[in-house]
Swiss-Prot record:
This is Glycogen synthase. Pathway: Glycan biosynthesis; glycogen biosynthesis. It comes from Caldicellulosiruptor bescii (strain ATCC BAA-1888 / DSM 6725 / KCTC 15123 / Z-1320) (Anaerocellum thermophilum). The lineage of its organism: Bacteria, Bacillati, Bacillota, Bacillota incertae sedis, Caldicellulosiruptorales. ADP-alpha-D-glucose binds at residue 15. The gene is glgA. It is an enzyme of class 2 (transferase). NCBIfam families: glgA, PRK00654.1-1. GO terms for molecular function: alpha-1,4-glucan glucosyltransferase (ADP-glucose donor) activity; alpha-1,4-glucan glucosyltransferase (UDP-glucose donor) activity. Signal peptide: none annotated. Keywords: Glycogen biosynthesis, Glycosyltransferase, Transferase. The keyword Transmembrane helix does not apply. It catalyses: [(1->4)-alpha-D-glucosyl](n) + ADP-alpha-D-glucose = [(1->4)-alpha-D-glucosyl](n+1) + ADP + H(+).
Length: 478
């Protein structure tokens, strides 16, 4: 089978969030299973010259964008065994950053149409186009509307992965007419119409052959009013077309046994003393009292309501009366940034607020923390809890989305489980869960068992890639 993976960003070329990590790691894992998958993405001007100088120009053609024909070049680079195609157009992509421009509707209309046109020109007989989030969700629509006559296109199946339903690519209806060249019939409730505008993501949900969210629980949540972002009715109505496949993490990148960014390397057999050394050195680095009796709770997160910072604000005064240190890394809403800075100033022996992002400090927090906090309001999948488990930091999570699917709550009677969880978005429940985790921490045998279970869970991309391979096979056999 031949899969074209269409995405707006991919590590290490362009990254603004977790989508880029998926676009690098999932194709790599699928190729290890023997799937011929290739990635296609925009050639942004921010891509490092170390990569652009190695790209090979393979073809160029014009792409219809409304009444105009725009130049499109295709460049190629193989990275870690994965072929990448880059869509080159300086008018749309020679700018700082990736998103947030007034003409994003036009930019990603062009990119989506360019992917469709590229099928004519690539030496690659595409069976499935795998699209991701709103940026490429209009590709299945375009295939049905404009390419039904093409022998190269009419056999192509499509799969859409929704990484976060909140971002839907909502644009004025003129984008549909003037840029996508779609007739009036597409501006209807059963097609692209979303209130008085159009939604790229809605089009992808309707016209793709399969829809995947990034966890089983999130696949159920998005069918409800609370999580459906206005599309719950549509998602409830597509039945088994919608499934959930949990994301993984790259075990070569996130490996405490080889990670050069942490103080001391360790694995699931040697963590007990070596992880403690990471904790002590992190405490020293952040000017916190060095002690193993004090529980170091880590958090690497955007500082937003969605990530549960509101709950932390509600309990922080009570939390700081307990034998804990709170180490937070991230940036976000000004209110939360200032709140954490104030507590770090008032309680310098208890709180370290690092209002920035540093991959090196993030790794040191994963390796040096005893517990890892993710009290999210919403979390489609969540990657941080998987990294924390890999590094032996026991997650405390709210039971939502991928957090519910990946963190099994510890049962002190059976000894099973590798984390702690609470159900409702409620500060009292979060505080009670932290207190319970602290009581278990004091029993070193129980805690050692929990950490070992967390570190030995398989959250690599292997299982996820196998699930996607099965979906691809089912589409080709349908």
């Amino acid at each position: 089978m031949k899969i074209l993976f269409a995405v707006s960003e991919a590590f290490p070329f362009a990254k603004s969030g977790g989508l880029a990590d998926v676009a690098y790691s999932l194709p790599k894992a699928l190729r290890n299973l023997g799937v011929d998958i290739r990635v296609i993405m925009p050639k942004y001007s921010d891509i490092h010259p170390d990569f652009t100088t190695k790209m090979k120009h393979i073809c160029h053609f014009t792409v219809p964008v409304g009444w105009r024909n725009q130049y499109c070049g295709i460049e190629y680079l193989n990275l870690d065994g994965v072929p990448f195609y880059f869509v080159d157009n300086e008018y749309y992509f020679k700018r700082p950053g990736y998103y947030g421009y007034y003409d994003d509707g036009e930019r990603f209309s062009f990119f989506s149409r360019a992917v469709c046109e590229a099928v004519y020109h690539l030496d690659f007989d595409v069976d499935i186009i795998h699209v991701n989030d709103w940026h490429t969700s209009v590709i299945p629509v375009l295939l049905k509307a404009h390419y039904g006559h093409s022998d190269k296109h009419n056999k192509i199946k499509t799969i859409l992965t929704i990484h976060n339903l909140k971002y839907q690519g909502i644009f004025p209806k003129e984008v549909m007419y003037d840029l996508l060249s779609l007739p009036d019939e597409y501006f209807s409730e059963d097609k692209l119409k979303f209130y008085d505008a159009i939604s790229f993501l809605k089009g992808g949900i309707i016209y793709s052959d399969k829809v995947v969210t990034v966890s089983r629980t999130y696949a159920n949540e998005v069918r409800t009013l609370s999580y459906g972002e206005g599309l719950h009715g549509l998602l409830s109505g597509i039945g088994e077309k919608l499934i959930g496949i949990i994301n993984g993490i790259d075990y070569e990148v996130y490996n405490p046994a080889t990670d050069k960014l942490i103080f001391v390397n360790y694995d699931s057999n040697t963590f007990e003393n070596r992880k403690k050394e990471n904790k002590f050195r992190l405490q020293q680095m952040l000017n916190l009292p060095v002690s193993d009796e004090i529980v170091l709770i880590g958090m690497v997160s955007r500082l937003t309501k969605e990530k549960g910072i509101e709950l932390i604000e509600r309990i922080i005064n009570k939390l700081l009366t307990l034998p804990v240190q709170l180490v937070i890394l991230g940036a976000g809403d000004y209110h939360y940034e200032q709140m954490l800075k104030q507590y770090a100033g008032a309680f310098p022996s208890k709180v370290s607020a690092n209002i920035c992002y540093s991959e090196e400090l993030a790794r040191k927090i994963y390796a040096g923390s005893d517990m890892y906090l993710m009290p999210s309001l919403t979390e489609p999948c969540g990657i941080s809890q998987l990294i924390a488990m890999r590094y032996g930091s026991v997650p405390i999570v709210r039971e939502t989305g991928g957090l519910k699917d990946t963190v099994k709550p510890y049962n002190q009677f059976t000894g099973e489980g590798w984390g702690f969880s609470f159900a409702n978005y409620d500060p009292a429940e979060l505080f009670a869960t932290i207190k319970y985790a602290l009581s278990i921490y004091n029993d070193k045998n129980q805690w050692r068992n929990i950490v070992h279970q967390a570190m030995t869970q398989d959250n690599s991309w292997n299982a996820s890639a196998y699930e996607y391979q099965k979906v691809y096979e089912s589409l080709l056999n349908s």
